[in-house]
């Protein structure tokens, strides 16, 4: 190996280490923004929201048929929340919801959600969103031990009505669930 290859490898590693330092430096800033958004949503909500679970779907490629035949995919339940739109047009929400899980047992979840929102049509009422939710849930098959969740969010909406969804990743016969609900803003 000649000297130029060593210089190239050293430069690559050095640049990566500098990048990691910047990530950690920005982590404090990101966490401060996260906490401030939660506080502002709680203290200054623009809307009160009603959540109605709509569907759970277990990805058929990731399950044995005999398992999916037994699972509940009609997650009736409900929830309430507070939300606001920020100066960039992005959505922030605090919510609590309970629904019937795959085993038809109650599963509560509460947390904070954020979506970057686009309004691609001339009609400003139509909106699309992509973001995340961070919260806590508890399941019967885990003895209702509180479990932290960090999941993706996506939505399509018109005015005060939004169809919002997430995907719970997993392994074979576990997780890999699409979950969606309606959110009505008042």
UniProtKB/Swiss-Prot annotation:
<keyword id="KW-0998">Cell outer membrane</keyword>
<feature type="active site">
    <location>
        <position position="102"/>
    </location>
</feature>
<feature type="active site">
    <location>
        <position position="58"/>
    </location>
</feature>
<dbReference type="GO" id="GO:0009245">
    <property type="term" value="P:lipid A biosynthetic process"/>
</dbReference>
<keyword id="KW-0732">Signal</keyword>
<dbReference type="Pfam" id="PF07017">
    <property type="entry name" value="PagP"/>
</dbReference>
<feature type="site" description="Role in the phospholipid gating">
    <location>
        <position position="172"/>
    </location>
</feature>
<dbReference type="InterPro" id="IPR009746">
    <property type="entry name" value="LipidA_acyl_PagP"/>
</dbReference>
<keyword id="KW-0472">Membrane</keyword>
<keyword id="KW-0808">Transferase</keyword>
<protein>
    <recommendedName>
        <fullName>Lipid A palmitoyltransferase PagP</fullName>
        <ecNumber>2.3.1.251</ecNumber>
    </recommendedName>
</protein>
<dbReference type="GO" id="GO:0016416">
    <property type="term" value="F:O-palmitoyltransferase activity"/>
</dbReference>
<dbReference type="GO" id="GO:0009279">
    <property type="term" value="C:cell outer membrane"/>
</dbReference>
<dbReference type="InterPro" id="IPR011250">
    <property type="entry name" value="OMP/PagP_b-brl"/>
</dbReference>
<keyword id="KW-0012">Acyltransferase</keyword>
<feature type="signal peptide">
    <location>
        <begin position="1"/>
        <end position="25"/>
    </location>
</feature>
<comment type="subunit">
    <text>Homodimer.</text>
</comment>
<comment type="similarity">
    <text>Belongs to the lipid A palmitoyltransferase family.</text>
</comment>
<comment type="function">
    <text>Transfers a palmitate residue from the sn-1 position of a phospholipid to the N-linked hydroxymyristate on the proximal unit of lipid A or its precursors.</text>
</comment>
<feature type="site" description="Role in lipopolysaccharide recognition">
    <location>
        <position position="67"/>
    </location>
</feature>
<feature type="active site">
    <location>
        <position position="101"/>
    </location>
</feature>
């Amino acid at each position: 190996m000649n000297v130029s290859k060593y210089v190239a490898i050293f430069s690559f590693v050095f640049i990566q280490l500098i990048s990691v330092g910047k990530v950690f430096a920005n982590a404090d800033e990101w966490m401060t923004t996260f906490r401030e958004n939660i506080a502002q949503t709680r203290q200054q909500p623009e809307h009160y929201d009603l959540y109605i679970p709509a569907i759970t779907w277990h990805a058929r490629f990731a399950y044995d048929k005999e398992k999916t035949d037994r699972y509940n995919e009609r997650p009736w339940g409900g929830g309430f929340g507070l939300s606001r739109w920020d100066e960039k047009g992005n959505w922030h929400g605090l919510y609590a919801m309970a629904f019937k899980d795959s085993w038809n047992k109650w599963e509560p979840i509460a947390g904070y959600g954020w979506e970057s929102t686009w309004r691609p049509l001339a009609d400003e009422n139509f909106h699309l969103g992509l973001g995340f939710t961070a919260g806590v849930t508890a399941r019967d098959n885990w003895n209702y031990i509180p479990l932290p969740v960090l999941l993706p969010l996506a939505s399509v909406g018109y005015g005060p009505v939004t169809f919002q969804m997430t995907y719970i990743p997993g392994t074979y016969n576990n997780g890999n669930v699409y979950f969606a609900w309606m959110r009505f803003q008042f």
